[in-house]
Amino acid sequence: MKKADRIYYGGDYNPDQWDEATIAEDMRLFKKAGINLLTLPVFSWAKLEPDEGVYDFEWLDKIIDQIWANGIYVCLATPTTAQPAWLSTRYPEVLPVDIQGRKRTHGMRVFFCVNSLKYRERAAAIAEEFAKRYAHHPALAMWHVSNEYGTYCYCPTCQAKFRLWLRKRYGSVQELNNRWHTTFWGRILTSFEEVTLPTELNDDYRFNPAIQLDYMRFVTDSTAECFLNEYRVLKKYNPEIPIQTNMSGYIKKLDQSELTKNLDVVGWDNYPWPDDPPYFVAMKHDIMRGLKGGQSYVLTEQSPNQQNWQPYNRLKRPGEVRLLSYQAMAHGADTCLFFQMRQSIDGQEKFHG
């Protein structure tokens, strides 16, 4: 599965931010630093598909060829974590509804409903364009599907699918009543159509752990389906290329042990909080190593310095990045990647790294 003869070392690269002179200088610096893997183009869906079914890959062709000419492999990411504005505007059903019942607007990345059929249709379509174009490119080391799954949604589509999921899981409303112990507080159901999602509108997310647990299981299954929607397309064109997605470390949003059953290799992002003790980071590494029975894993992201999203974003001390990287490799990572290779000039993550 592995093309390089040593640990993959590199990170996310977003060349659509830079001019040709900057990119050429980056290639020189990458070679000097011993970089041998770049992940791209994670957030570039809007540039690659400026309108529905209209694709522009020429700029990406040029970048990938330039990277390969410098002896660097690529981890190609389907850019489906950040849908274009035209998709959200034309098909508002792709946007999630939050736990307060509010329809979210376009803007944030990972702001899509994993159960939206239109989202899955367009995500599979651009994944196929990637696969047709790059599945046998000599630079391709692995695929990276979307980015940091974990958005909850409470839209009508999710409501309907949750009822179907419960029907399949329990078979009858009588069994559902038994498992959820609905006799307490007079919550007895007479039909699956009476089931509602656990939101702030009914406070079930706080006061009914059985409903909340099943909802979280449902979200995990729905997310796995959404991932497989792209995975199957990519595998069809070249089954030899491993496929992963990056998980956000130790989170309870998704059952990672279920999600990783569908991955060829585990990937996760290591962003320790300032007050995290070293053993907590070590535990996260061990969890990732254990998800595929001890198989080595991909450290898909870590910051070369500060984050930009924690309450207190401290600078790393001299040598700390090296120690964090060594810790990952000691726990079984065979890939050490950063976000990102050149700090953004502007935008949402300007102060990251």
Description of each model-found segment:
Residues 1-22:
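Boundary/entry segment of secreted carbohydrate-active catalytic domains
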Residues 4-9, 34-36, 68-74, 136-141, ...:
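Short, well-ordered coil/turn segments that N-cap beta-strands
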Residues 11, 30, 38, 67, ...:
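Conserved, mostly hydrophobic/aromatic
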Residues 44-58, 86-117, 157-159, 206-212, ...:
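Surface-exposed, active-site-proximal loop segments in enzymatic domains
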